[in-house]
Amino acid sequence: MKQVVYTASPNSCQIHVWSLNNEGELSLIQTVDVPGEVQPMVVSPDRKHLYVGIRPQFSIVTYQIGSRGELAQQGISSIPGSPTHISTDKQGRFLFSASYSYNNLSVSLIDDQGIVGEPVQVIAGLQAPHSANIDWDNKQLLVPCLKEDRVRIFEMAKEGYLTEKRAEEITTAMGAGPRHMAFHPNQQVIYCINELDSTVDVYRKWEKYRTVQTVDSLPADLAGVRWSADIHITPDGRHLYTSERTSSLISHFVISQDGSNLTLAGHYKTEIQPRGFAIDHSGKYLIASGQKSDHISVSSIDKYTGKLTELTRYPVGKGPMWVTVLAL
């Protein structure tokens, strides 16, 4: 399997494009100067385009992906707020942008050439939406709103129009601050990292989502303000990882067979202030970015235990905060 790693460094307005080999080694393919501070990134479902959100001129930039993973800019379109997280539907027809600072969620059409256009819907009045996550069936969009302590749920029509389902929303503990989500491959369980108390909520789907577990991701005796960031699951659904920026820790959970129960298995020091990380498509490697270290690091994931072993660190641009992996 050929894989490419994209790292976004907003403080230097750069994307670094890396080749990832089977031994977990990275080789730099390209350094792209982006027309703004690049933050969230997402690969299109057909793996032909990379979409990135930039500021201060709030926009989505469309890049065509070449045969080696290299990028060529194809288009740029405006959005109504600073992009905190972007995603697409499963068919690659719509792009969703959540704006934490501007308290809105937008829907943009993606044309037949894979280029993102202007927004066709803007939903205002959300309090600090931090991500937009399409479900397995491509029917519902789940939006954790950090300052509301709830996950709003929107039904998606065929033309991409979103309608909120207030009766189905998920509430968290007061002051938890829901942020990012990971989806189990069994299509029944979702995990949400809460930024402010560093817990992980486990939601299982029946007629509606129900919280079946809340577990702390950090050592009980850890001092300091909690500031969790990212969450990802291995492709086989056996291991879950979260990052926390004050302690610069990656936390590891073992997942039960049905996905409903997490067991904390360990903590690992990583890059300073790990805002974003990713797991490769083989489930063998975890790539973490350090906003304060200006480096990324690659760690191997033990196939059976899920234990992390750091392999190598690589310098990138300034303030790296997002990692995306593409399987060519």
Curated annotation (Swiss-Prot):
Annotated GO biological processes are: glucose metabolic process; pentose-phosphate shunt, oxidative branch
| EC numbers on record | 3.1.1.31
A Pfam family that this protein carries is Lactonase
- Enzyme class comes to hydrolase
Q: Read off the SUPFAM superfamilies from this record.
A: Nitrous oxide reductase, N-terminal domain
Q: Specify the pathway.
A: Carbohydrate degradation; pentose phosphate pathway; D-ribulose 5-phosphate from D-glucose 6-phosphate (oxidative stage): step 2/3
Cellular component GO terms, alphabetically?
cytosol
Q: Its Gene Ontology molecular function terms? A: 6-phosphogluconolactonase activity
Q: Which cysteines are joined by disulfide bonds?
A: none
**Which keywords does this Swiss-Prot/TrEMBL entry list?**
Carbohydrate metabolism, Glucose metabolism, Hydrolase
Q: Does the keyword Hydrolase apply?
A: yes
| InterPro entries listed in its UniProt record | 6-phosphogluconolactonase_YbhE, Cycloisomerase_2, Lactonase_7-beta_prop, N2O_reductase_N, WD40/YVTN_repeat-like_dom_sf
Domain of life of the native organism: Bacteria
Keyword Phosphoprotein annotated: no
List the Gene3D superfamilies hit by this protein, alphabetically.
YVTN repeat-like/Quinoprotein amine dehydrogenase (2.130.10.10)
Q: Which reaction does it catalyse?
A: 6-phospho-D-glucono-1,5-lactone + H2O = 6-phospho-D-gluconate + H(+)
State the family it belongs to.
Answer: Belongs to the cycloisomerase 2 family.
What NCBIfam families does this protein's entry cite? PRK11028.1
> Do you know which HAMAP family this protein is assigned to?
6P_gluconolactonase
- So what does this one do? Catalyzes the hydrolysis of 6-phosphogluconolactone to 6-phosphogluconate.
- Designated name of the protein: 6-phosphogluconolactonase
Source organism per UniProt: Photorhabdus laumondii subsp. laumondii (strain DSM 15139 / CIP 105565 / TT01) (Photorhabdus luminescens subsp. laumondii)
Q: Gene for this protein?
A: pgl
